[in-house]
UniProtKB/Swiss-Prot annotation:
Cofactor note: Binds 1 [4Fe-4S] cluster per subunit. The cluster is coordinated with 3 cysteines and an exchangeable S-adenosyl-L-methionine.
Assembly and interaction partners: Homodimer.
UniProt-annotated stretches for the region Disordered: 1-21
This protein's name: Phosphomethylpyrimidine synthase
GO MF entries: 4 iron, 4 sulfur cluster binding; carbon-carbon lyase activity; zinc ion binding
Cofactor: [4Fe-4S] cluster
Function according to Swiss-Prot or TrEMBL: Catalyzes the synthesis of the hydroxymethylpyrimidine phosphate (HMP-P) moiety of thiamine from aminoimidazole ribotide (AIR) in a radical S-adenosyl-L-methionine (SAM)-dependent reaction.
NCBIfam families registered for this protein in UniProt: PRK09284.1, PRK13352.1, thiC
Domain of life: Bacteria
Amino acids binding Zn(2+): 431, 495
Length: 629
């Protein structure tokens, strides 16, 4: 089916939410933690646990609260209608600051053209609000407020969200132990407060991507002293995917834990696709505006102009895009440094700007007009994601002069953005072998003065097409531990094709693992609560709790049921790997019971004696390695 035919089927009167995205997780409920005002209601997911079996003490297990990116989609009390979009969360907060104005309509030329095109009526999102903009002379960025000493509702919101009811968890005994972390100089407090959030944003070490026109947003924070976040990419291309499919990818991705989503559409109807996505997104949406600008000139990079790009920025800012990837560090003098690379320039945005620079033999207009861009950003509170257009596309090219030259320029641009109180994060590689990853993180911290780092992986080897979610997940866990604030997911289809829903889920779960492993290694307060709860459930053979506490309950349950599908297996004190006779945890329980009965105090002797008895029993039963269950 052609794109045109697919989108013709996506009528605003008949669009529906993806059914798989609105199912609550088993034994989970959406809870809301209220802040200092009634309209600050911070969503979290609470997982209810079973009582410990009598054999193990019969204690009641407190519910476990986990971070929730799924928005209202998993709240059974909310009626979802993608044709109307999500409820307005932030307008009362924005109104109370009294520094914005409602425009009479779209002010970008392209936005006005699309709105007046009658042929697009069937595709267009029906409930478009008139956009907001800062009043003349005002700066509406979260960084500007933070530097004035103001704690905004958004700052309070993310502080509550980051803590995940940590005090209650400690009181319930869910954090009886947590290994000390090694944070490589990060300053992670025992509890996240709104004042700490304000300080980090004022310092430039964290950002809250929150365009004033994205009122459906549930605010989140990106910074090395907070939980490591992940981004998922969606977007159509000239080869396939409809608007409805992209909205479904959005809702599916946030169900599994995508903290932000980038719309990288390069095909037809980019403007309309983005409107549907933003109006239905509770998470920040990022874009690469140069992609759409290139479409407007028919794909000829040399025909790009500052005026066209400026109009594209305003168009997207008025829709509510929360952060822009802008490749302003690709300078004319750096392009020759890529000539001897194995893989040259692999960034789409980087290659576009390199081609423009060479065609005109002029400096990158994104660099020369950077302060003009800052004026637009602070009028809507769009955050910079300064693009790494010269990132290495192979491990052979890692950490070369082109990559690090651009990084130094991004550091210079960061200071200019901060002069305008514009929130900024820095994008990073790419393909980097493990031994060179820490150098990337250290150099970014030095060049960019601790602005949040946002990396694609990095992929640690180039030999595994089809498995690059794994090659990159390794690098992502490492750089997250070293201080990277957000990890851009990689799917199994990386380098091979556009990801489908299953690929999106696989990429997100892989990166949630990497991010959580980094949080554990950094010693983030409360990071080990979920691990401890799942380990306890595993030791007590509470199978349903094991599934439900995991990042992907569906897959865990499915794997278990492949060999032990009956309900009785959900209470069995063994799994199919070892069977009932050779389960190490069951044996440990028997050893403990024996020690208690015999009043043996020396643990080493106790374990040795117990295992010896198990060995003798094994011999008596015929020394058969495998038994029919």
């Amino acid at each position: 089916m052609s794109i045109k035919a697919k989108n013709a089927a996506h009528l605003r009167e008949s669009a529906q939410v993806d059914s798989g995205s609105v199912q609550p997780f088993t034994r989970s409920q959406k809870i809301y933690v209220q802040g200092s005002r009634p309209d600050i209601r911070v969503p979290m997911r609470e997982i209810t646990l079973d009582v410990t079996p009598t054999d193990f003490g019969g204690e009641i297990n407190a519910p476990v609260t986990v971070y929730d990116t799924s928005g209202p989609y998993t709240d059974p009390n909310v009626i979802i209608d993608v044709r109307k979009g999500l409820a307005d969360v932030r307008s009362p907060w924005i109104d109370s600051r009294n520094d914005t104005e409602r425009l009479p309509g779209l002010s970008s030329n392209f936005g006005q053209q699309r709105l007046s095109d009658a042929e697009l009526t069937a595709l267009r999102f029906a409930h478009v609000r008139n956009p907001r903009r800062a009043k003349a002379g005002a700066n509406v960025s979260q960084m500007h407020y933070a530097r004035q000493g103001i704690i905004t509702a958004e700052m309070e919101y993310v502080a509550i969200r980051e803590n995940m009811k940590l005090q209650e968890a400690r009181a319930a005994g869910l954090l009886t132990q947590q290994h000390a972390g090694h944070s490589f100089g990060a300053s992670i407090p025992k509890e996240i407060t709104a004042e700490f959030v304000r300080e980090e944003i004022a310092r430039g070490r964290a950002i809250i991507p929150a365009n004033i026109n994205h009122v459906e947003l549930e605010p989140m924070i990106i910074g090395r002293n907070f939980l490591v976040k992940i981004n998922g990419n969606i977007g159509n291309s000239a080869l396939g995917s409809s608007i409805e499919e992209e909205v479904a990818k959005l809702t599916w991705g946030i169900r599994w834990g995508s903290d932000t989503v980038m719309d990288l559409s390069t095909g037809k109807h980019i403007h309309e696709t983005r409107e549907w996505i933003i109006r239905n997104s509770p998470v920040p949406i990022g874009t690469v505006p140069i992609y759409q600008a290139l479409e407007k000139v028919g794909g000829a990079a040399e025909d790009l102009t500052w005026e066209l790009f400026r109009d594209t920025l305003i168009e997207q800012a008025e829709q509510g895009v929360d952060y822009f990837t802008i490749h302003a560090g690709v300078l004319l003098r750096y392009v020759p440094l890529t000539a001897k690379r194995v893989t040259g320039i692999v960034s789409r945005g980087g290659s576009i700007m390199a081609k423009w620079c060479l065609a005109h033999h002029k400096e990158n207009f994104l660099y020369t007009h950077f302060e003009d861009i800052c004026e637009i950003m602070k009028a809507y509170d769009v955050s910079f994601s300064l693009g790494d257009g010269l990132r290495p596309g192979s491990i052979a090219d890692a950490n070369d002069a082109a990559q690090f030259g651009e990084l130094e320029t991004l550091g210079e641009l960061t200071k200019i953005a901060w002069k305008h109180d514009v929130q900024t994060m820095i994008e990073g590689p790419g393909h980097v072998p493990m031994q060179l990853i820490k150098e990337n993180m250290d150099k970014q911290l030095e060049c960019c003065d601790e602005a949040p780092f946002y990396t694609l992986g990095p992929l640690t080897t180039d030999i595994a097409p089809g498995y690059d979610h794994i090659t990159s997940g390794i690098g992502a866990a490492m750089i997250g531990w070293f201080g990277c604030a957000m990890l851009c997911y990689v799917t199994p289809k990386e380098h091979l094709g556009l990801p489908n829903k299953d690929d999106v889920k696989t990429g997100i779960i892989t990166y949630k693992i990497a991010a959580h492993a980094a949080d554990l290694a950094k010693g983030h307060p409360g990071a080990q609560i979920r691990d401890n709860a799942l380990s306890k459930a595993r030791f007590e053979f509470r199978w349903e709790d094991q599934f439900n506490l995991g990042l992907d309950p569906d897959t865990a349950r499915s794997y278990h049921d492949e060999t032990l599908p009956k309900d009785s297996a959900k209470v069995a004190h063994f799994c199919s790997m070892c069977g009932p006779k050779f389960c190490s945890m069951k044996i440990t329980q028997e050893v403990r019971e024996y020690a208690a009965n015999q009043r043996i105090e020396a643990v080493d002797v106790d374990v040795a004696k117990g295992l010896a008895e198990q060995a003798e029993r094994f011999k008596q039963e015929g020394s058969q390695l495998y038994k029919k269950v």
